[in-house]
Every structure is written in structure tokens, then in C-alpha cells.
């Protein structure tokens, strides 16, 4: 994270404010604005940790606040410790401690042994904007609280941020869900991350998700999520991109398209390439359409790039998809409350029936993709190359970026889609 101080704004400030609140050091509700109340809360936290109370969030403060950023503490066992005393000290549940430490024998705790202790809040926040730093902390937190979750970086963005893939389950049916191909559609990232945490928690607790036992879902399916395809672009939109050459270059690109609001109208990666127009499925047609619309150079949106799969983020997802060979993909976008399920005249077996199911449980319409947007997308490429069901889900209504006030309705509409897609029913 960047150094944050009075006057700083953006997603990283909101993340810090969330962590201070979790650590019970007060401050305002997370609003992404580093004002006097936030400074006072940070100073109180710094004093409690023996740090210089300068009210500046730097590396030392970030390390001290890490348990509340990632959702767990690491405790070194001392003589006299028990699971009950640890649960009381950290306000943690015994079940959560046991889930995070599957090899643990609670009757033979050894001094010097290290345990992961989940803290009493969800790892995934749904009330603040997302950014790459929050994604990294959430990956860290979920993989430590639920060791069966596998995480890997499938590639790097233009600015070398990891593009994470998270996998859970051991079933024969492999499915792949992605989100935030487009920077100003970042609200789809917490959608996938909340689904993942909900599924993991339900599995550990023996509970259901959308009426299906989580244990059965993970027995029948292997779910892989790529929740943040465009980390650099999301950082730009949510105010987490540091000052420097990349931000200056993006501003110069945006200045060439004054009709597009900046940064809220930014969909592309940080180099001005639209990641969902990068796939070799009618790419030349997409190029002709978008060039005719004036997007013939790096732009905040709709520039197809110099050739297919030249943007590192799209290339990474395509290569990963080919290696995974999934039975189905969902690509999450905003907005329109609509499901796009076809590419040209391709209609993979079972795809219409699933689209009808998704529409029924979500209340979304299912439609053919409009011609001008119907080429070079990830879903298009998957259907063309794999002849299997692929869907673009356009969540919510309004102007991107959608406000977080829509998150709960988006969550309610998509819980069934995410579950039925895994099960294939």
C-alpha cells in the first residue's frame, strides 16, 4: 500500500479505515477520505502498538495493522495456552481455529508452535471500493483461514500486479468464473470474493449455499475464480494507483477522449487496451467496428489493441483457460441485468437450458449479444474454441461504476447463478 496521510483519498484509505474499525480503534465509517477523525484513530492505534503516533500510515503501521487487513493473527503457543484461552483472547471461534489449522491436536499444544487464529469478521468487505492491495490481503486471509483454498498468480498486469486465480473443490466438473475485465466494473470483484468466502464458510460449518450443501457442491465441482482481471485499471478508477508515470500516461490517454469521464469512465487496462476486446474470436470485426467509432488508439475504453492477446492480462486468462479446460465459464460485468449466452450461431449443447435456469433464479433477461459488442470478448472466444457454455453476466443497472448500494441486490440475484453453474443444473 502507499503511504497515506491527511488529505489522501481512495480505496486504500477506505481499506485502512476498515482495518482500524476492525481493530476497534474508532474513526469514521470508511469513506476513503483521510481527515482529522481518521488521523486520530490511526494515532490511537499507533500508540497502542508502541509506534510513533505521527498519524501517517506507512510500512510500520501497515505491518502492525496486518491482522485486521487480512483477517487472521499468527499466535505462538506459550506455556498454559489452550484453544479455549486463545478463542477468548482473540474473540475467535474454536471451529474457525480448527478449520484454519487442520493438523492441529488441541490436546498437545507445544510451546513455540504457531497457529493461525481467524479474527471475528469476514475477510471480504462489500462496503468499500476494491483495489489490488485489498485483493492481495483477501487472498492471504482466505487461504490461511481455509487451507483447502488454492491460490496462484496466473500472470502479471502491465504494472506487474498479480492476476490471482483461486480454486476450491475436488469435483470432476471444472468451472471458471472471472470478474473485472473492465476497470470501472470492479463491483463484480467483491461479488465473486463474497461467493467464495460464503462457500468456504458453509463447507466448514456444514451449511448450505442456495439450498445445496456446500460439501456436495465442492464434491461435484472444482471452482476456479479470477476475480480481478484488470488490477491496474481498477486501481486507477478507485483512486489506489500511485502518482507517477503510469497515472500520467493514463491521464494523457483520457485527455484525448474528453467525452469520457475520467477516471470513472475508464474500462481499459492501464495501457488503454480494452481487455474484453482482446480475444481471437472475430477480433478483426471488432477492430473495424471500434475503429469506425473512433477508438483506433489507446483509449479509456473500446480500443482492441494492436493484435489479439497482446495485453498481458487477457493473454494470461486465455492461457490459463486453455490449461484448465473448464466445462463452463462465467464472465462478470456491469450493467444491464442481462445474460449473454451465444456467440454468432454457436450454441453449445445445454447452453440455452442453463441460460433459462440462470434467468429464472436471477430475474435477469437472457439475450443475444448486440452486434456492435458481439466480437472479441472472452465469452465469445470460449464458446468458439471449446464449444461449451459460456456466459457474460451483466449485473446491476445504471452508470458504471455502479454504487455499492447496489451490491446486495446484485448478490441476491447472482447467488443462484454462481451455484447452479458449478453444479451444471
Predicted features by range, described:
Residues 3, 85, 96, 116-162:
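Short glycine- and acidic-rich boundary segments immediately preceding or forming the N-terminal edge
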Residues 42, 97:
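Conserved hydrophobic/aromatic packing and binding residues within compact polymer-binding modules
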Residues 29-39, 54-58:
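A glycine-rich, coil/turn loop motif that links secondary-structure elements
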Residues 172, 186-196, 200-340, 348:
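Active-site/substrate-binding loop(s) of hydrolase catalytic cores
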Residues 164-172, 180:
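Short beta-strand-to-loop junctions in surface cap/lid or active-site-entrance loops
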Residues 1-2, 18-31:
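Extracellular-facing binding/remodeling surfaces
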Residues 279-425:
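Metallocarboxypeptidase
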Residues 8-18, 31-37, 67-91, 113, ...:
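Primarily a LysM-type cell-wall glycan-binding module
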Amino acid at each position: 500500500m502507499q503511504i497515506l496521510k491527511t488529505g489522501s483519498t481512495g480505496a486504500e484509505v477506505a481499506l485502512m479505515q476498515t482495518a482500524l474499525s476492525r481493530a476497534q480503534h474508532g474513526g469514521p465509517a470508511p469513506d476513503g477520505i483521510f481527515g482529522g477523525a481518521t488521523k486520530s484513530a490511526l494515532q490511537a492505534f499507533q500508540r497502542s502498538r508502541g509506534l510513533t503516533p505521527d498519524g501517517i500510515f506507512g510500512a510500520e503501521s501497515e505491518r502492525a495493522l496486518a491482522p485486521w487487513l487480512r483477517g487472521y493473527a499468527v499466535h505462538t503457543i506459550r506455556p498454559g495456552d489452550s484453544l479455549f484461552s486463545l478463542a477468548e483472547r482473540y474473540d475467535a471461534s474454536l471451529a474457525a481455529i480448527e478449520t484454519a489449522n487442520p493438523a492441529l491436536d488441541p490436546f498437545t499444544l507445544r510451546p513455540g508452535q504457531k497457529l493461525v487464529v481467524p479474527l471475528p469478521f469476514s475477510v471480504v468487505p462489500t462496503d468499500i471500493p476494491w483495489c489490488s492491495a485489498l485483493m492481495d490481503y483477501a487472498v492471504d486471509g482466505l487461504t490461511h483461514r481455509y487451507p483447502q483454498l488454492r491460490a496462484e498468480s496466473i500472470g502479471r498486469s502491465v504494472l506487474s500486479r498479480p492476476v490471482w486465480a483461486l480454486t476450491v473443490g475436488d469435483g470432476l466438473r471444472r468451472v471458471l468464473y472471472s470478474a473485472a475485465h473492465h476497470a470501472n466494473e470492479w463491483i463484480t470483484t467483491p461479488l465473486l470474493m463474497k461467493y467464495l468466502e460464503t462457500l468456504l464458510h458453509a463447507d466448514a460449518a456444514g451449511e448450505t449455499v442456495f439450498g445445496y450443501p456446500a460439501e456436495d457442491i465442492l464434491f461435484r465441482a472444482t471452482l476456479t475464480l479470477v476475480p480481478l482481471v484488470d488490477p491496474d485499471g481498477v486501481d486507477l478508477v478507485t483512486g489506489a494507483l500511485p502518482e507517477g508515470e503510469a497515472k500520467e500516461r493514463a491521464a494523457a490517454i483520457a485527455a484525448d477522449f474528453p467525452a469520457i469521464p475520467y477516471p470513472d469512465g475508464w474500462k481499459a487496462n492501464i495501457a488503454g487496451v480494452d481487455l474484453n476486446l482482446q480475444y481471437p474470436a472475430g477480433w478483426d470485426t471488432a477492430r473495424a467496428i471500434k475503429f469506425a467509432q473512433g477508438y483506433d488508439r489507446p483509449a479509456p475504453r473500446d480500443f482492441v489493441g494492436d493484435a489479439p492477446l497482446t495485453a498481458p492480462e487477457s493473454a494470461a486468462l486465455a492461457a490459463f483457460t486453455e490449461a484448465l479446460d473448464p466445462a463452463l465459464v462465467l464472465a462478470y460485468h456491469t450493467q444491464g441485468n442481462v445474460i449473454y449466452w451465444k456467440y454468432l450461431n454457436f450454441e453449445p449443447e445445454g447452453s440455452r437450458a442453463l441460460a433459462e435456469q440462470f434467468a429464472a433464479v436471477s430475474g435477469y433477461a437472457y439475450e443475444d449479444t448486440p452486434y456492435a459488442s458481439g466480437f472479441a470478448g472472452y465469452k465469445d472466444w470460449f464458446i468458439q474454441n471449446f464449444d461449451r457454455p459460456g456466459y457474460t453476466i451483466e449485473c446491476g443497472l445504471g452508470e458504471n461504476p455502479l454504487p455499492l448500494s447496489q451490491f446486495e441486490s446484485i448478490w441476491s440475484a447472482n447467488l443462484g447463478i454462481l451455484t447452479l453453474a458449478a453444479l451444471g443444473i
